[in-house]
Amino acid sequence: LAVTWLAMRIVRVRTPEGRIDATRVLLATNAFAAGDRRIRRRVATVRDRILVTEPLTAEQRARIGWAHRQGVYDTRTQLNYMRLIRDPAGGDRILFGGKLAYGFGDATSAPPDFERRTYESLAGAFLRTFPQLADVRFSHAWSGPIALTTRMAVHFQRYRGGDVVWAGGYSGFGVSASRFGARVGLAVLDREDRPETRLRFARELPSRIPPEPFRGLGAALTLYA
C-alpha cells in the first residue's frame, strides 16, 4: 500500500491490484500502517497470539462450569481472553488468546509466529486457567499484529490538512470497536460536527512512543511487568 499526494489536492492510493485517485482518504489499516514514520511516532506494533482447542466433550465442558457463551478476559496489562466457539461438526471449542510480544522495529510479520515454542507460554496460561482440561489438545494456533498506543484506544491522525486520516490504535480491542472507529473516522474526514468528533479522543493524540532501542525496552517493561 502506498499513498501519494498529487496536485490539486488529489490523493493517489496504490496497491498491488491497482490504484485509485480521491480527494479524501481514510486509512483503516491499523497495525499495517504503523511502519509509516509519522504514524509510528504514536503507535507500536505488537503481536497477539491465539490457541483453539479441539471440540470439548459434554463432560469436559461440565468440568469447568462454563454454562453460557459469555466472553471472558482478565484485567491485567498482559491480559488473557477466551470465548467458546461452536464447531460445525458439533460441540464447542475454546478460543484462548493473549501473551503479547514485541518484534524489534514494529515487525508486522515474524518467523516465530510459525514455531511451536512461540505458543508454549500461552498453552501454559490456558492450563493455569483451566487445570481441569489438562487432557484437551489444541488444533489451531496463530498470531498477528495489533496497533498499541499509550491510550489503549482508537485515535485519528490527520495529514494534508485533514484530507487523509489514519484511524487505528485499538490496542487489541478492535474487533467490535473498529466499527465505531470507522464511523467516527469518516466523520473526522468529512469534518462533520457531531457529538463524537467533539470528544477528546477524536481531537487529541496519544503520547509519543520513543524510537528504537528505547521502544523495544519500553514494550518489554510494559508487557512483562
Model-derived features with residue positions:
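Short alpha-helix boundary/capping motifs
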Residues: 14, 154-155, 210-214
